Amino acid sequence: MKQWFIDQSTKHPKRSIIVSILLTMLMGSGIQYFVIEDDFMKMLPQDIESMVTWNELKDEFGSTDLMFLGFGIRGEDALNSKTLAVLWDLSRALEGVAQVDEIICLSTSDKMESDDGFLEVSALQEYRDLDEADIAILRAYLDGNPKIKTRTLGSNGDYLNVMVRPLVGAKNDVLVRDLEQVVETYLSDYDVHWGGQAYLTGALPLLIRTDVMMLMRAGLIGMLLILLFSFRNIPSVGMVLATIVLSMVFMFGFNGWMYHLTGSDAFLFGMLNTSMPIILLTIANSYGVHVITKFFRKMRSNKDTRLAVEASISSLLLPIFLAALTTIAAFLCMVFAPLESLLGYGISISAGIAWAWLLSTIFLPSILVLKKWDPDSSAVSHASHFERFVLVFGDHVIKRPKTVLITGAVVVIIGAVGIFSLNIEVNMKSFFKPTNPIRQSLDFMDTEMTGSMDLQLLINADLRSPEVLNQIVSIQNFMESHKSVTLSISIADVIKQMHRMVNEDDPLFETIPDSREKINNLFTLYSMSGDPEDFSSLVDYDYKKGLATSMMRSISTSDVVILVDEIESFLQKDEFKDLNITITGMLIVFRDLVALIIRSSFISIFASILIIALIAGYFFKHWIWGILAIVPLTAAVILNFGLMGIFGVDLNHVTALLSAIIIGVGVDFALHYINQFRTLLRRHGLEGDISRETMQDVGFPVILDAASNMAFGALLFSEFIPMVHMGGLMVFAMVSTSMATLTLLAVLLELSKKYLARIEGITVA
């Protein structure tokens, strides 16, 4: 099999290149079916308990996840004829947007008034154009009904609040785009702020992908410049780039074909897939760097291109194959992930890795064979400054193995301690820097409006019972006592307002009536001039199931957990034992989702490490080699997650995927080092300096690979904090995986070489 691969590039290079390109184009034709999905909700698992409850709630009450729009002019009273006329036009235009179910604001809300003991229900803003007298009446009504005022008007009175209720199943990304187009038309003269989890899930994926793709291009350019500095040869850099590009085309085409053939949403390219091209790029670059550096070393000794290529592939075929196989196995462990999109992620990137392996062992060597190389050129005949530095570094490591081992162990232990300080955070507000316009809008909504989050309580009880309704009032009062909750709304508030109005608008009667009959009478009075369907978002037709919604300021994930625990503890009181209440909403889904992602990520990491150890042990013919292969990988994983805890880098559904990069690159370094060490051990026994020779042969490509991939530290300049963290962690991942290989693994092999020689059947004196 090894000879077949060698023959493809040394005997049939042109055919190999043409076939590789044609097969890439064939698979790449699937790009026509490649679908980018910016609807964040598509990635949510439908079978977790909180999601099932939330879906049931939406089926009964419609969408509960609102978008918030605040607009006005700072310091100018929003209750003026011009602004109210704009609100009138805007609300009707927004109602005409395809995926909007309801617009809640001053111009769409109703008011209740007393009329000789009867309820008179009419529009809160009756006309588009209001005069000063009309505005005075409106202002007085809002002052007398603080909950309505809080819901529709900013705390300083200079901004109006508009709530958008999407249709169930609406695509938030499309809806956000359509809403922003309408707002741009009507509110060009006003300061505009958006908020709400629904808005963020619609706006964020496209923003992140656009930002990352731009920075990825910068990272790619940086990577190529580092390679050029090290190789000192433009064609060799172009060869690595060609391998990367063809691998990318193959992966995206494969993804498109899989979606076309299966129709599965797992193969939609969403926000979580944004890291796929970065990971494949680093892996394809790694394979290419090893081939080019090995080729240059062989050219220095034999001066013959074909012989150099043959020797390079003969030496690298097994380690690159094992690196690809173990990395693919690691990514296929994503089948344990709770998200369908991660299943497609793992399968698609595995296809890209497999193709990168074939290209690096057939396509790339074929180009090397056809290129006319000058054996006396500096790129071929002389080691670069970078390469000489690595040799000096390696000598220091090998001369002080115990010191290096102890130092490395201490660093890893410190990292392990840091893991216990990891903070899980998925509040999307924390994704933005304080200077970002979206972050500033969210801050505005939190400080001056009703907030940018909401939480729902699904109540199963007799909602015409005075006792039950008073219990709901108590629960709402408890909710509103929390500093993050700005407003709580339920059917109990409507009943209290009706009770007040039929009693001559006396605030003393803003209470729950003391009998079921009185409550039934209130609904009867309302139906005479109002529509009972007005309550459909608060209570079901039979008044057996209701919804209490709390508007909230943005809080962290840990604070969400604390708040939910406090609510659950409060509901355990005896007075609420007859109520069946479920806490639900997108906040709860996100809380559970992140817990699932984090748990599945760690399961995937452990499964990957185990599989890598088994595969390496099998191919190297002893389990001890498998254990040694995962030493750098395990150390790097511990260090990265530990330092995240130490430096306060949040763990979320973006940074949790960092482990995939560590595994993809870390295992490659270790397998190359072990393969070369084992080859020299079998060839020379314990004679000579095996560790130094291994370091000379493998150290430079490992460091060059890591250094070139560090160019993706360009993500540090992202507008999004998780991407900034990922950029920094990626740089550190390159450092940790390469250093762990060239220090911990190197000294372990050096210290145990006699034992390893016995394993290989070599006589040890």
What are the roles of these predicted feature ranges?
Residues 298-325, 682-704:
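Helix-loop junctions and hydrophobic alpha-helical segments within the transmembrane domains
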Residues 22, 210-242, 246-250, 254, ...:
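Internal alpha-helical transmembrane segments of multipass membrane proteins
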Residues 226, 321-363, 613-616, 639-650, ...:
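Hydrophobic, glycine/alanine-rich multi-pass transmembrane helices and their short helix-loop junctions
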Residues 33-78, 84, 130-152, 165, ...:
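Solvent-exposed, non-transmembrane loop/terminal regulatory segments of multi-pass membrane proteins
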